């Protein structure tokens, strides 16, 4: 399992396939593995990137509450894209992942080829 080190916090991720990038973020209490069915169907045409938020799945669980915020999540997504040499991606997610993807778009519209927002509240 590959990890990205973000100032001492390890973030688990996977990147499968080739083609335009899709960055998918999971819902609260879930993990990147929730996307496995979609990854299997998309990886022949896309580079599908999934990741575990801080405090989820195989990523680290920092004890400092200041290390959890929307700004941190946006910075984590940006760092992951940079780490994987992805300039622009279809950015999407479910629930918390959808809300975070919208926030990422608001902060970095130039890095979003499109948005895929699923079951996300206002």
Spans of features found by a protein language model:
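Alpha/beta-hydrolase fold catalytic core
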Residues: 1-22, 44-47, 86-87
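Serine-hydrolase catalytic-loop signature spanning alpha/beta hydrolases and amidase-signature enzymes
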Residues: 27-37, 48
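Alpha/beta-hydrolase active-site loop signature
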Residues: 29, 53-57, 122
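Active-site loop/oxyanion-hole signature of alpha/beta-hydrolase fold enzymes
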Residues: 40-43, 49-92
